[in-house]
Structures are given as C-alpha cells and as structure tokens.
C-alpha cells in the first residue's frame, strides 16, 4: 500500500518511538474533528501495513446542539471504513456543575473513563488520541506558565502506558492539508474557538507572537520535547533502579543527586497522586531521619538513606 508523505511521517514516528506493533489492539478516540478524522484515516491505512487491529470510541458530550449529529457522522465514517464503532452519551455540563470542576476538566475525565471502560471490555491494550504538534507546543507553554520541572516540561508523550499519541510529529497545517487533499469530511467544534479556556488563549493570543519571532517555532519546541522525552526515559530507569514497590508502599533509595527529586515525583504518580512542586520536593529530601510528611494523600517517612512512601 502506497503511503502519502503525511502518513509516512506518522509511520516513521510510530516506529522511532515503538508506539505500536502488529500484535496491538488499538482504540482510537475520534470526536469527528479534522485532527481525529485524520487519525482515523491514517490508522486505517497503517493497520493494513503494520497488522494491528483498531476500533473507534466516540463520547457524545451533549455540549453542542449538533452533538448527536457528530456521533452519527463518526459512526457513518467508521461504517464506510469497516471499523468497529462504540459510543456513549454523557452530560458534561451537569457533571461539571455537580462536581464543581471546569467543563474542560469534566470532559476530559469522562472521556478517558469511557476510553478505559471500552478498552477493558474489548480486551484491547492501547488507546490512540489525535494530539498533534500544536497541542504539544501549547501544553509546554501552559506548563511553563504554571510551573514545572524538566520531567513535566516534555508536555505530551508519544506513549505512556496505554495512552498513545502517534500524531505529535505533525502540525495543524499539515492536518488541514491532509483532509483537503483527501476530501476527508469532518465536523467543526465551536468550543475550539472559545477564549474562555486558558489553552485557547495561548493558541489565539500568545502563539501569534511566537510566530512573529520564529515562523518555525513549533519545530523548535518539538526538538526540545524530543530531548526531554529521552531525559524522561533516563529518569524512569533511575526510578526502577532505586525503588522497591509493594502493594501499598514504596521504598526509594536516595543518592544525593539531581535524580532524587525526580524519582520522588514519579512515586506520587505511581500512586495516582499529583506530584509535589520543586520546593516541596526539596523539603522532603532535606527531612531528618525519622521525619514524616503528609502530602497529597501520601505519608513519607525519612530513613537513613531512603524514603518510605505509603498511602
């Protein structure tokens, strides 16, 4: 099967970062927008080239009058491509008010809950989302503004456990060209243009300033992200070397080097907890022997040259 340049680029990225193999069963998150419809068409072709299996999951957020039409649109697209389709309807606005969280946070939580629920039901092993280079840039800027360490600066990751992002190597302009050249239909989401969301403020107010300074700013950030992804792999190796994990606790060996702080933050992630900031991490490292700190639902006890982290 002949691949277009856009598809070849994604195929190379998948191989470089070992995102998929022929034994994988992959659930695609498809909303119907141009980015996820590109993902659908590219993965449909690559499934034949690489031999993996795909299905589609679509969450109807009930956030727009056209939401039911969007669901029907994606269902029809999957039918044409002979790809299994699974959907669920939720009321994001009601969930947002009831749980006192932002609409964006609520939507993401419900979306991934549905993805994992479907993943388990189908006995699949990976989820693929349509995040692209523009999303990567925006996430990196957002994290810098909020405050982050090197480990978190990488923004979005090509593969992390079940979640994969095979389109991080292409930007929005390339996606627009791909859907235009191939006459791929898609739906437009008005919330993508709402300046009520911090990420869209970055997209429509801050990004143009970067473009004036360096028209190829996204490629610069992508190169930086790749360096950080390599760094993250080294941090993970250090964590494996220095940690002993049991059912409800984790022992970390400290070696008085830069990686101590990084492996402490990974320990929090292992327990599904938000990691402490750099200042709080430094306080943990400097605790006296026998000292105890409780942070984000975890208890941390300082031993002579190690930390015991417990739920």
Curated annotation (Swiss-Prot):
A biological-process GO annotation: tRNA modification
Keywords: ATP-binding, Cytoplasm, Ligase, Nucleotide-binding, tRNA processing
GO MF annotation terms: ATP binding; tRNA(Ile)-lysidine synthase activity
CDD domains from the UniProt entry: TilS_N (cd01992)
Any Pfam family matching the protein: ATP_bind_3
Gene Ontology terms: cellular component: cytoplasm
The keyword NAD is assigned to this record: no
EC number: 6.3.4.19
Subcellular location: Cytoplasm
Catalytic reaction annotation: cytidine(34) in tRNA(Ile2) + L-lysine + ATP = lysidine(34) in tRNA(Ile2) + AMP + diphosphate + H(+)
Source organism, top-level taxon: Bacteria
Residue sites binding ATP per the record: 31-36
Domain notes per entry: The N-terminal region contains the highly conserved SGGXDS motif, predicted to be a P-loop motif involved in ATP binding.
Function: Ligates lysine onto the cytidine present at position 34 of the AUA codon-specific tRNA(Ile) that contains the anticodon CAU, in an ATP-dependent manner. Cytidine is converted to lysidine, thus changing the amino acid specificity of the tRNA from methionine to isoleucine.
Family assignment from sequence similarity: Belongs to the tRNA(Ile)-lysidine synthase family.
Alphabetical list of HAMAP family matching this protein: tRNA_Ile_lys_synt
Full protein name: tRNA(Ile)-lysidine synthase
Gene behind the chain: tilS
